Curated annotation (Swiss-Prot):
Pathway: Cofactor biosynthesis; adenosylcobalamin biosynthesis. It is a peripheral membrane protein. The gene is cbiO. InterPro entries: AAA+_ATPase (IPR003593), ABC_transporter-like_ATP-bd (IPR003439), ABC_transporter-like_CS (IPR017871), ABC_transpr_CbiO/EcfA_su (IPR015856), Co_trans_ATP-bd (IPR005876), ECF_ABC_transporter_ATP-bd (IPR050095), P-loop_NTPase (IPR027417). This is Cobalt import ATP-binding protein CbiO. SUPFAM superfamilies: P-loop containing nucleoside triphosphate hydrolases. Pfam families: ABC_tran. Gene3D superfamilies: P-loop containing nucleotide triphosphate hydrolases. It is found in: Cell inner membrane. Forms an energy-coupling factor (ECF) transporter complex composed of an ATP-binding protein (A component, CbiO), a transmembrane protein (T component, CbiQ) and 2 possible substrate-capture proteins (S components, CbiM and CbiN) of unknown stoichimetry. Subcomplexes composed of CbiMQO can be isolated from membranes but the CbiN subunit is not isolated in association with them, suggesting it is only loosely associated. Expression of just CbiMN in E.coli confers some cobalt uptake. It comes from the Bacteria. CDD domains: ABC_cobalt_CbiO_domain1 (cd03225). GO terms for cellular component: ATP-binding cassette (ABC) transporter complex.
Amino acid sequence: MTPILAAEALTYAFPGGVKALDDLSLAVPQGESLAILGPNGAGKSTLLLHLNGTLRPQSGRVLLGGTATGHSRKDLTDWRRRVGLVLQDADDQLFAATVFEDVSFGPLNLGLSEAEARARVEEALAALSISDLRDRPTHMLSGGQKRRVAIAGAVAMRPEVLLLDEPTAGLDLAGTEQLLTLLHGLRAAGMTLVFSTHDVELAAALADRVALFRTGRVLAEGAAAAVLSDRATLAQGGLRPPLVIDLALSRARSRPFGPRSALPRTRDALAAQMAGWTRR
């Protein structure tokens, strides 16, 4: 099946010659959740900015639905309608006076009628469980609320792919769990998710697939359980397996565990397997 979004041999260097992306290729399967995992400075955010057309590669190309993208005004408008982006700092994304006005901006700029734009906004606010915030001034929102409003603004465009840069940055535990529930809901509704993170626990909880980055290159890419259980490769990126996978791997040293695909990736899955261990 043709990937919904793909990067082919992307290279991009900042002024001074430091390469953020170094001949990087990556495919995003439709309907899946892909984690772009790696330490700070690995090129994760730079890739996302290429995947929605904000940055133009110095070499290589981005394909959307198998077709090479262009950077004309018309091409970019269509591209950003199909591929939404939520920035790491929601304050960089919110600019209207109220939540409703902010979420309305994208649909209105698509040329939709006021009635259709309003319907999309109401739908997005409901999907993100923030309908009660519709008239709230954006500067009076909490960090978690701002993040959800920024996501609602992208969702209101009805994109095929949603890109999220460090989606849980700055959120407390409760805010992170609420956001995970919302993102799982978008994923279950068929939206393709691509998110950058340095948090292996988040990658385990949300991703179907993981691409491990280091200095603008892909070190490893594959099913989440396989990549997140590969200690040696994770160490090259300055990371280690998530706690739930680490505990399961430790158990497997004394008793065969089974295929890596069966490794638990959430606390609930680990608890269920631990209950099975005590019965054996």
